[in-house]
Amino acid sequence: LMINYIDRGAIATAAPLLQDELQLSPSEIGWVLAVFYWAYAPLQPVMGWLADRIGPAIVLAAGFALWSLSTAATGLVWGLASLVVLRLLMGAGEATFYPSALSLLVRNVPPTQRALATATMQFGAVLGPDIGTLVGGMIMLHFGWRTMFVVMGCASLTWLFFWRRRLRAERESQASSAVAA
C-alpha cells in the first residue's frame, strides 16, 4: 500500500513544475489530479470481481505493473492528453489494490490477527505520501520532475520481483483446485 501511495502522490509533488513546463492552466492541472479517481473508484468493484475469478495475487501483480509503468511513463509525457491517459491507466492499475489485498489478507491471516494486519497495511497509506514527497522532492531538486517519475515507477516495479513467489503459490493452488474438481 505504501508503494501505490508513493506513486499516486508523485503528481502533486511535481504539479507546479509540470504545469509550468507543459503550459497547463490551473483547470487543466486540476483535471490531471482528478482523472486518476475517474478510473480508480468505478473500477474497484470490477477488480474485486476479477480477483475472485482469477486470483487476487495475479490481479494485484497486473495492477502493480500497470500503475508502476504508468508512473514511469509520466516522465515521458508531452502534453495534457498523454498525461490524462497515463493518470487514467494509473487509476485502473491502483484499483486492483484494495480488493486484491483484502482478499489476500482474509485468506492468509488468522482472524485473531486481521485487525493488526489491516492496521499495518493502512500504515503504508499514511507513510507512503510522506516518503514519496521527501524522496520525490529530492530527486526533482537534483534531476527534475521527469526523472522523478521514471525513477519512482522503475523502483516500484522491483516489488514484482519479490511478488513472483506469491504468484507461483497462487497458480499451484489454482491448479490443485482444478485437479480436485
Where are these regions (language model features)?
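Extracytoplasmic
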Residues: L1-P26, M47
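Conserved MFS/SLC helix-loop-helix module at the cytosolic interface between two early adjacent transmembrane helices
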Residues: P42-W78
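Cytoplasmic helix-loop-helix junction between adjacent transmembrane helices
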Residues: L86-V126
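Helix-loop-helix hairpin linking two adjacent transmembrane segments in secondary transporters
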Residues: M121-E170
